[in-house]
Each structure stands twice: as C-alpha cells, then as structure tokens.
Curated annotation (Swiss-Prot):
Pathway: Quinol/quinone metabolism; menaquinone biosynthesis; menaquinol from 1,4-dihydroxy-2-naphthoate: step 2/2; Cofactor biosynthesis; ubiquinone biosynthesis. One of its GO terms (biological process) is methylation. PROSITE patterns: SAM_MT_UBIE, UBIE_1, UBIE_2. This is Ubiquinone/menaquinone biosynthesis C-methyltransferase UbiE. Keywords: Menaquinone biosynthesis, Methyltransferase, S-adenosyl-L-methionine, Transferase, Ubiquinone biosynthesis. GO terms for molecular function: 2-methoxy-6-polyprenyl-1,4-benzoquinol methyltransferase activity; demethylmenaquinone methyltransferase activity. Belongs to the class I-like SAM-binding methyltransferase superfamily. MenG/UbiE family. It comes from the Bacteria. S-adenosyl-L-methionine binds at residues 76, 97, 125-126, 142. SUPFAM superfamilies: S-adenosyl-L-methionine-dependent methyltransferases.
Length: 253
C-alpha cells in the first residue's frame, strides 16, 4: 500500500505538485466551475462516447431489484438514474458527491424529470464516508476516483460500507492500450480539449486539469492491485474503447 498523500504532505493536481491538504479545495473549484456544463465536459472529453460507456457500466453491474446502491461522485445523476431502473421501486439509490454544486445540479435535474422517490442525496467525502458498515449491495464511482486525494483511503471506505457479497465498480479514464492511438489521444487532450473548454464553457484551465488528471491516475493493473490491497476479492478490469476508459470490479466476500 502506498504512503498516504497526507503523510507525505504532497500530491498532484494535474501535473502540478501541491500540498495534499489543498487538493480537495482545488478540485472543488474545478467542479464548481464545470457543474452546469458537466455533460458538455464529458462529451468533449469522450467525443460523446461516455453515454454508451455509462450504460454498459450499469448494465453489467451485479445489482437486482430491491438493492440499495451508493453512487459516489454522482455528479449530475445520470448513473443514478440508470441504477434506479435496475433496482426498481423496491430499491434505493444514494447519490453521493463531495461538491455541493454538482449535487445540486443532480438533484434539480432528477426532480425536474419527476424522479423523486427512491433517491437520496448526500454530500460526502469518499475518503470518510458517513455510512455504517455494510450499508450497500452495490457501490459505483464513475469519472471520480482520479480526483480523490487519497485513493487508497477511498477504496478502503468503499469496502467498509459494502455488504458481504456486494460489488464495487469503478469507471474511469485510464491508459490507452494502442500505441498508434496515443499521439492522437494526447493531441485531443492537450491541444483540442482546453480550446473547446474555452469556446463552449469559457474555462480552458479546468479542462486542462481534467486532461492532466487522467495521465496521473493509476493505470489499469495498478488500480486492480490497489483494490486488492483495500480488501476486495476477485478484482478484475475491462478496457473499453482501447483503454480510454476501464471498468474495475471487486467483491466483498
């Protein structure tokens, strides 16, 4: 298990080294800035494919009617809506996010669609979840783990609140596997994406950070190992779209 950033005192914010205690605030400023344009951000970062990734992520999850699910870094609620379709009227989805602005957007969006029953909204830090042990049948986090300061602590907390027999799933931008595609992907990430962010959201810096944060996130095998160290069993991952994103899964047994 790697040393906690809070112990070493420093961590990364994109390609910058910053004090570990400051990263949460810096990340919060990014997501407060992009909250109202979050779906646009994902469209720009993924060329629109994120919607298919998310549908597959939920469709292949271990979940059944009546289950209680926690969706961390739940953002604008798109994953939560898909999960609610799986758990049905008897089940419940808790949408958790550390950023109040993102949580507000998600709540407003679902309420405006008439989706009220069976959803709860909790502002929470993935490193210290405010839930009892063994609270959830399934735990998901999509495009959020890379922004967490202490990922090991977050994975341990995910394991703690998961019921025995439950599954945790992580959908995250990862390491591209095709060498020929890497220069194209880098060009899009560092040359095109910030300009699109400036053009459509008047915010090039946030989009620059988001591109950099992907490169600092642990690659597939490393994250699989981190999940195992946190206690998860039967850990595995599946690359999507040539490793642009990966789905990691682990179980509490």
């Amino acid at each position: 298990m790697s040393e906690s950033p809070y112990t070493s005192g420093t961590t990364h914010f994109g390609f910058r080294d910053v004090a570990a205690k400051d990263k949460q605030k810096l990340v919060g400023e990014v997501f407060t800035s992009v909250a109202r344009n979050y779906d646009l951000m994902n469209d720009l970062m993924s060329l629109g494919v994120h919607r298919a990734w998310k549908r597959y992520f939920v469709a292949t999850a271990q979940v059944k009617p009546g289950d209680r699910v926690l969706d961390l870094a739940g953002g604008t609620g798109d994953i939560a809506v898909l999960l609610k379709e799986r758990v049905g009227n008897e089940g419940a989805v808790v949408l958790g996010d550390i950023n109040a602005g993102m949580l507000s957007v998600g709540r407003d969006r679902l309420t405006n669609r008439g989706l009220v029953s069976g959803f709860d909204y909790v502002q929470c830090n993935a490193e210290a979840l405010p839930f009892p042990d063994q609270s959830f049948d399934l735990l998901t986090i999509s495009f959020g783990l890379r922004n967490v300061t202490d990922k090991d602590a977050a994975l341990r907390e995910m394991y703690r609140v998961l019921k025995v027999g439950g599954q945790a799933r992580v959908l995250e931008f990862s390491e591209v596997t095709a060498d020929w595609f890497k220069p194209i992907y880098d060009f899009h990430s560092f040359k095109i994406l910030p300009r699109l962010g400036q053009l459509f959201a008047r915010d090039a810096d946030s989009y620059q950070y988001l591109a950099e944060s992907i490169r600092k996130h642990p690659p597939q095998e490393s994250l699989k190992g981190m999940m195992g160290e946190a206690g998860f069993a039967r850990c595995h991952f599946k690359n999507l779209t040539g490793g642009i994103v990966a789905i990691h899964s682990g179980y509490k047994i």
